[in-house]
Each structure stands twice: as structure tokens, then as C-alpha cells.
Amino acid sequence: MMSLVTAADLKAWISRGGELAILDAREEGEFGHGHLFWAVPCPLSKKELRARALLPRKATRVVCVDGGEGHAQKLAAYLTSLGHSDVHVLKGGTPAWKEAGYTVFTGVHVPSKAFGEWVEHHYGTESLDPPELQALVDSGKPLVILDSRPMDEYVKMTIPGSVNVPGGELAYRIGDMVPDAETTIVVNCAGRTRSIMGAESLRRAGVPNRIVALRNGTMGWELAGFTCERGQTRTYPAGTPKSADLALQRATAFGDENGVKVISRAAAEELLSDESRTTYALDVRAADEYAAGHIPGFRHAPGGQLVQATDQWIAVRGARVILADDDTVRSRMTGAWLRQLGGWEVYVVQEASKGATVSGPWKPQVPEVKPATTVTAQALAAEKGVTVVDLARSIDFRAGHIPGAVWAVRGRIPKIEGAVVVTAPDATLAHLAAAEIPGARVLEGGVAAWKAAGLPVAADRQTPPDEACVDWYLRPYDRNSGIEEAMKEYLSWEIDLVHEVERDGDSRFGAW
């Protein structure tokens, strides 16, 4: 069943607790211009993939929202067609929410970012500004700078001399990387909250060093007149750290303090088979570890990103979350923060690496896919008069695409005369889109296969232009103009989130 719900009723549902997912049917770029605090992007263009990942239980109460364009009704109808039984649409969408006097938030990953700011206020995380860091570097005193972002962000720009250690790895790796207590540890990100969360993770774990967050990250560094390094790949040593036992002691204390429960694989399977509750199964290790082998059914969600971009993986408030890694260190640290962020019931799998595993990425089953005819990169390169439609993220299309390709969002592909070949980072998405274009084929292996074949790639930072990037909420560095002003606005936005959250009243950070 699908029904309309008023803003007042939805507000009451949020306050009441229990399982609830609020899915916004717009593209991320549109979503970022104004949305509900607990809303999670589930754009129509990727609904078959996102809905199955975000809603593992079909009896969960779901409210679909949009900006008043009618997308929410389409998403709700799709969910109903899949068998979801408690689906609603917010009457009037986000505009009606605002008209009712409730807070509308801009930006993305808002609960996670607001939580990071709360952590700094609550725990008194020490920070230093860029000139202070430069003075510390110049002093010659023992110092290590750790960049807590994923490697793809680190490569683009980082603080000179820093080493990439994503947030979920920090407490696990720190004993090997900084074995003495005299070295000052500085954690940075691009802005504020991942620096704060990384530094505070080390402090909560009981690391005895002086630990500080770089205030305003790489943005603040460049705004202060310093230059970032680009193209660096420095990172932590691979494999299990020698100090893993110490890391486990530290993580156990933090996890226990925050109510993280440890269970066996058999118990995890029982929870996952319980149809009365929504249960997420997430593996918080690094991507290469996950790909090499993981528990069947567990999605990859690197720990630091799971805490700071939670809505990529978790949509249901009141759900259970099961985390896995090799020795529970990363799971316990991640789980403790998830408990404080959203009060989810968190479990950690003991001896997760023992027993059956599968390799490769997690992929949802999408039975409605009708496989299209495929074409290899070499064959496509030899053809004439073919239009390639690329469904990659707009910022990825800018960085590299097949010459002459047209960038588009599924569902908004312009009418094209003649032969069409669709490519997308996800093959399922490519086949879904091709089925909506008469006669369209799919590029086998996507642009990655094109590059692997040694074929030419075009790059153009202006295409698509900023205003056309509806699929991606542009970060300051993604923009083609006004970058410095955008950085200042972003940093101010993060700082003010704590106050906006207080005004909204729909969150309760801390111990649950």
C-alpha cells in the first residue's frame, strides 16, 4: 500500500522511534540543495540498485520524499511493485516540510557531518590551524601527519608529507606507524569532520600521544596560502599490524563502553534471517581485503566512510547493524561511533574470517534487468556514427570519457538519432538504461575496458558544466569557478551544523 503522510505526521513518526526510512527520490545534486535531516538519497535513476541495498526488509516503514516534482510517487510505486508493504509519500514534499516550520538542511551526509561537529564540542578535540602546523613542521619536533580520507581523495591533494590512513584504519594501524608516545599526531581531511573523527578515534582508543585535528583540512591549508601536494600515494604498510593485540585491547574498551555486542557467525546468520527487524551486514575493511574474501551477503563499507557518510549504506533508523573485519578492531571502533551517531543496535562478528567466504564485489539481484546486446571496446572503436551515452558520475566523466561521448543521467537521456551504445561504471545500470532506448547496446566492461584496450580518452573539466551536475553535489574543489568562496562557505556550513541540528530536534547524539 502507498499513502500520503503530512509533514506533521512524519515529524511524529521520527520522534516516536522504531524502524523508519526516509528516501529522497531526487539526484544527489538536487537533494543537496535542501532535504530532511534523516533523508537518504535514492535517486530514480539508480532505484533498482539503491532500494535493494538500503531496504533489506520489505515490511519496513518507508517515506518517499522529493522537492515537489513527483519523483517520490514514482519511487513509492516502484517499491510497492517490489513487495514493500508500508510505503508512504510526504505530501507536498520538502517544500511542505519547510512550510510546516521544520528545518531543511543543505549539503550531503548531514547526520554524519553534524555528528563530527558534535564530537568536537562534546569531547573537546584539540585542533591547530595551518600556520600552527607549519610552525610545528619547521620546529623539527617528532611529528606525523595522517590524512584520514580514502586514497582517491588523497591523491587529488594532501598536506605535504602526510601519509594516507583512512579513518577506519587509524586505531588499527597507529601502533606500528607511531610506536612512541613523544610524536605528535596530526589528522587531516579536506575540511573538518573526518579530521575530528580520526583524531578523536585515536584519543578514545587511549593512544597516549598528543593528537590534534588540522582545523579546516586541505581547504584551510590552501586558504591560508599554503600549497597542497598532488599525485601522492603514501600509505600504511599492508597486512596485519604487529601491534594488532594492543589495538584490540583499545578497541574493545571503546566498543564495550558504547554497547557494541560481539557475536558468532552463526548468531549473525540468525539475526539476518529474522524478518521482524531490518539488519544490515557490512564489512569495514579496506577494499582489497574485502575483494579477496568476505562473508557472503556482507557489503563493503570502509569504517571511516561508514561513520562519515553513513547514508551511503544505512537508511533505516532503528535497524540492527552487523559489522565484520579480521579481528574486530575496526568493527568495534566503527560500531562505537555508529552507536553514538544514530543509536543503531550494533553487533560485531567474532572470527569473521573463519568459515566460508566469497570474493569480488557485492551486487544486488535485479531480476527486472533485460540484458542488452553488448559490444567490445575494440569493436566500438572501429564503428562509425555511433553515439556513446555515459552514465558515470559527472565529475568522473569530466576526468575521462570516450571521445565524443554524451554524459547523461538515466531517465533524462536526450533523444538521439542513430545507433546508441550505453556505458556505466555499473553494468546493471547500463543494461537498465539500454532497455529504455530502442536498439541500444552496452559497452562491455565500460570505460574501464576502453582504457585497458589502450584507446584514447578525452577529458574536459567544463563538460558537463557545474549547473548541469545534478547527479553529484559539487564539493568546492569540483567547481569551475568561485572555488575559494565555496571553500569558505563549506567550512562555515560544517561549523553551523551543530546549531541547525539543535533547532531541528530530530537527532540525539551520544550514549543511547
Regions from the PLM with identified roles:
Residues M1-A21, A25-V144, S148-Y280, V284-T387, ...:
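Rhodanese-like catalytic fold shared by cysteine-dependent sulfurtransferases
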